[in-house]
Amino acid sequence: MKANVKSVLMKKYCRVYQAGAKLLMAALPWRSPKMLSGSGAVKKLPEAVRDRGFHKVLIVTGPKIRARGLLNELLEEMKEKKLKYVIFDGISQNPTDEEVENGVGIFLGEKCDCMIAFGGGSVMDCAKGIGARVARPKKAIRNLQGLFRVLRPIPVIFAVPTTSGSGSEATIAAVITEVQTHHKASINDLQLMPRFAVLDPCLTVGLPPQVTAQTGMDALCHAVEAYTNDTYNSDFERLMCSKAVRLIHESLLTAYEDGTNLQARQDMQEAAFHAGRAFTRGSVGYVHAIGHAISGLYGVPHGLVMAILLPHVMRAYGSSVYDKLADLCDICAMEVDTPDGMISAEVRAETFLQWMEELKEKLGIPKYPDMIREEDVNQIVKWAQKEANPVYPVPEIWDAQEMKEFVLAMLEGARLEGAEKNE
């Protein structure tokens, strides 16, 4: 009985907190990055950097990006424009507080005055973390995690995404993992929004199909979670979600099957950007909260975990998301078959859910997360609860026990899926 009362009070507290946050969201000075887009757009970036009076750039990137030669055109243009630069490429797929500190040391030691974040979400998150620490030299990453704890201008970031998923080029969030604890948490502050985003589809042509799939599903997750949350959204965020989901519905499978299709690649970059801008205000939900805990604990790609969990969490929300998922079904002009011709919100929502599940299968993404260990379930729940409640305006609030039941259901699903494969 006491547990039930505690749960009810917790859920009421979350909704009161979110009502206050909604008022704050409406008063904040939201902005979007300026955009350079289209094939070859990256060549225009050095001129934009120079025209804004910057002289020495820290290029934050990943070792694989550098090895693949994706930086070459940018570096040639920078030399032509006589811009000095230093490259920092010591970043893992889940950036850590130690990597951020390494970047801070280079930025300050080399007397850089801006950054180009050239890579996927991990690179951009690391660049934002570097910026936050430069702005707040006396605060460790742990003390900057949460909402609005930077509150000072950071060095200007020019974001060049080489994947189409995180949307970090259009967000105020940076997800950083603590090396000692493996805890993965977000820094969220308006100061972290990049000033420029360069959407050049040519940079994504060489992505392996698996990466295209996982990052594309991550973008879908951002859009669907932001749309179904809705509490913090304005009409602008709803429009961004709608555009993102429609573009993903039209182009993700094409980009996966034919990576050289520049239109599909451009569509996916725009989808990731729109979804990123949408969840910046609209927020994410339990897919991300649970997914961050899992990917941080086991070191698996962020997009993979999001892709696996998305349909399961939406199904677990039940009737609380029928209307919103039905909207997305309509936005994508999906065909809905019913015997009597009556197409209810529940039927349209189910059509959208089935599309997500079928898309996962076509993209080669497992149905369940097979990396979860039973002894880690309580830790996953603890971290996810800490991240999500009371901030995320989810359609249905789960207490720790309800979330544990969901994670255990994922564990059992993975066991059954594994047993079927071994038969």
Predicted regions and their residues:
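Glycine/threonine-rich beta-strand-loop-alpha-helix active-site module
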Residues: 98-202
